[in-house]
Amino acid sequence: MSSLPKTDFNVPKYQLIAQKREANAAEIEAALEVVREFIIKKKLILYGGIAIDYALHLKGSSIYPEGERPDFDMFSPNHVEDAYELADLLYEKGFKQVGTVRAIHVQTMRVRTDFVWVADLSYMPSNIFDTIPTLTYKNLKIIHPDYQRAGLHLAFCFPFDNPPREDVFSRFKKDLQRYNLIEKYYPIPVVPVKSTYENKTFSIPFKRVAIHGFAAYALLYQTLNELRMTCKVPEWKTEFPQPSYSYHKNDKNITLTVDMPKAYPSLVLATYNPEEIIKEMGLHLTEICEPYMDYSPPIFKTKDIHFFSTMFKELAISMIQDNIIVVSPQYLLLYFLYGAFATPADKALFLFYYNATLWILEKADSLLNIIQKQTSPEEFMKFANTSPFVLTTRVLRCSQDRCTFSPAYRISLANDVQQSQLPLPKTHFLSNFLPDISTLPYNYYPGKGKDRPTNFSYEKNLLFNIGGKCTQLAM
């Protein structure tokens, strides 16, 4: 029986050929050049895959083949007006079917010409935009890979986000490859920071919260140490923090005693409904912080405990010891990056703990390799699937049948309610959480003869309050 001839399945190669042979290829390339000049003129900051690719070009590497059409994703502190302005510019230069529309991601506007997307503009509050680190590639500002790491960790933290193309299926592999390239070419230097610790004791409900922050680091470190002793590996010499903890629990609560840095003595927990937990624990809410982009959710602070809200999302978690719930290492890494961005005075401390968490994962991987050699494939898979050190799809469940309600889903539901004029039943879980769609940016099509919309306000829509601002509450 004759065999089929070997075929070259170089997908990127044929994608480039297909792009060049498109009927409107010349028009698209011309439009992208207009976009490029617009980005340079407005000093906008590229992010996403193109920013990673350009940063890698500076190191002699890449993630995209040479000559691939750029996919311009950019941050702007005034993204709605900038999107409208770019649409007007393209229309004035003779491009057809120009428009700008709201993207699925609510803080993003998409600009198209001839039904081809040529730019995505995403909102970044000016207090963040003016301070984030950047690099320059061919006169274009690109977000620094240190900041880009946060977006890559984020996908691993919420595996069921963005249905029906959940991140676990659509992003895990791609983002892991990109992260490894960033770590290879732009590692964060290890700069030891000496910390003074104090022994703190907290009593918390263990079934509905995940331990986070510096306490989670302590639990993960000691879990690693126990795994090391099980594998009979000599103790490692390390400059990274080695905090200890102890606990006891009953049917409802866990009493946790843990070494905490004196600079950050508050316990951090992640939970689906922080206000309900705070009320049940008899605590007094003292401060509320708005989200910091996508990298930190709303934070509800009490005197000794800070609650990170995971409402509408399913957070990946790990289980250690006697079914104690801790956040996944990826969420912990994201927390330390967020701390470095949001609190410049303690940037060195947070980056030291970030590298310490990476070290934990590196050592855990070496121990898992030992276990794999000593056990059957079935036994190893069972062990690895319960390990707190690997990527996981185990999530912190909410009290509803479904937990993942993205802003896009809630906006779509609000549109349906408005068009049908049939309000949701008061008993519906989302009845009090539908956004006011009249406060969202309007789509704009310059060729239709209508004036550019002018009534959008960032302040009037909570979905755009993502600058991390904290508000103290009256006692």
UniProtKB/Swiss-Prot annotation:
Any GO CC annotation of this UniProt entry: virion component
Organism this protein belongs to: African swine fever virus (isolate Pig/Kenya/KEN-50/1950) (ASFV)
Gene Ontology MF, one: poly(A) RNA polymerase activity
InterPro entries tied to this protein: PolyA_pol_cat_su (IPR045355)
Subcellular location: Virion
UniProt-recorded name of the protein: Putative poly(A) polymerase catalytic subunit
Cysteine-cysteine disulfides: none
Keyword Transferase annotated: yes
Reactions the enzyme catalyzes: RNA(n) + ATP = RNA(n)-3'-adenine ribonucleotide + diphosphate
Record-stated family: Belongs to the poxviridae poly(A) polymerase catalytic subunit family. Highly divergent.
Keyword Transferase: yes
Single GO BP term: mRNA processing
EC number: 2.7.7.19
Protein role: Polymerase that creates the 3'-poly(A) tail of mRNA's.
Induction text: Expressed in the late phase of the viral replicative cycle.
Alphabetic keyword roster: ATP-binding, Late protein, mRNA processing, Nucleotide-binding, Transcription, Transferase, Virion
Principal cellular location given in the protein's record: virion
